[in-house]
Amino acid sequence: DKPESHPEPTAPANDADVDAMKQDIIDRTNALRKENGIAALTTSDKLMQAAQVRADEMAASGVYSHIRPDGRKYMTVTDSQYIGENIHCLEDWALKEKSLPETVMWAWSASAGHLKNMTNSRYGSIGVGLAKGTDENGEDCWYCVQLFMDTGGSISWVDRPAAKQ
């Protein structure tokens, strides 16, 4: 008999759980915008894809940064120049009492720069990416990414994850 394997308590059971967490972050972001009298963001498939690339890059490299693993700026993940980015590395121990979406939104809302991105009326669309990884200290964590694009902006391509140089 093989021993039973049990997932980590903080790990989502499947992709549907991760998708639900991403949607919860989008919903919470739009609730914050509504509280501030700002129009809701629409979800962009291309921004969702790009945000996931950014989260995956950080999870693969273990480096939490607005600079991509190959040294390029975060906005090179798409062909749009009008992208804003919020990132957070959320260690598993921080998720003991509250959900990932609630915890990361609290952290972003407590930071003036992150809050400014979430409440910027110039932005019209959002994408969210989440990836499980380890941080620079070897701690299990989630890399959380929000990407924002100006109203009327467009993306024709999304880059592949960049490798460390």
Report residues per predicted region.
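Ser/Thr/Gly/Pro-rich low-complexity, disordered linker/stalk segments of secreted
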Residues: 1-13, 160-165
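Intrinsically disordered, low-complexity regions enriched for glutamine and histidine
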Residues: 4-6, 64, 112, 144
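Context-gated lysine
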Residues: 2-4, 22, 34, 46, ...
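Short, charged low-complexity linker/loop segments at the C-terminal edge of domains
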Residues: 151-160
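Short, well-ordered surface patches within globular domains
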Residues: 13-75, 121-127, 131
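Second-shell loop/turn segments in exported
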Residues: 8-20, 34-44, 85-98, 102-105
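A well-ordered secondary-structure block
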Residues: 73-152
